[in-house]
């Protein structure tokens, strides 16, 4: 989705589990992110949203890589204008991708340090590490990313506890920023929109990724809540 400024940075949006690119939570985020003046691309994973195939850690990462290659090779977008954004499971996919390709900045929302660790916490009587086929060990990979990173996480998150996000933050290289938002795992972009999108706007502006007009623009949604 191109914005009004064709020269604006592109945001590669990677959604979470139990969702599709058309899910309401994703659409709310698209609207707010595009209001910053960004162009946006949101590839769908195989096995999601009617796309054929069986999802796995390797397959969703490859689908994200295909979206990145589309921006670089088909549209000719330089890595210096690509922001990788991941929410929930998509944040783990974003780490996998960003560990291997250059980018301008990374934004992670509700990010787990390790899906194995979350499984072990919830089911301590099961040998999760032995049987889990898609561990998404983000904390072991994030140190390879040298782009600026923003972490958004809610203390009310019952799906990916905020402690997981902090562990991942600690494993990341500088420059990095961790910001708490309200709304649990699903709704920060809705119930805490001004903090959520205002933080993203400030972070991108700090790293030279927003035009002056976008940096100074007031966020406002059609229902008036931004």
Language model feature labels by segment:
Residues 70-74, 80-125:
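Primarily recognizes the serine-hydrolase "nucleophile elbow" in alpha/beta-hydrolase
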Residues 166-188:
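Catalytic histidine neighborhood in serine/cysteine hydrolases
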Residues 189-203:
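Post-His helix in hydrolase/transferase enzymes
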Residues 138, 147, 161-170:
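Short alpha-helix in the alpha/beta-hydrolase fold that links the catalytic acid
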Residues 1-70, 98:
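Membrane-embedded segments
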Residues 144-146, 150-153, 157:
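Short beta-strand/loop motif that positions the catalytic acidic residue
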Residues 104-105, 111-147, 205:
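Mobile cap/lid helix-loop segments that gate and shape the active-site cleft of serine hydrolases
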Residues 155-160, 186-187:
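Acidic catalytic loop of the alpha/beta-hydrolase fold
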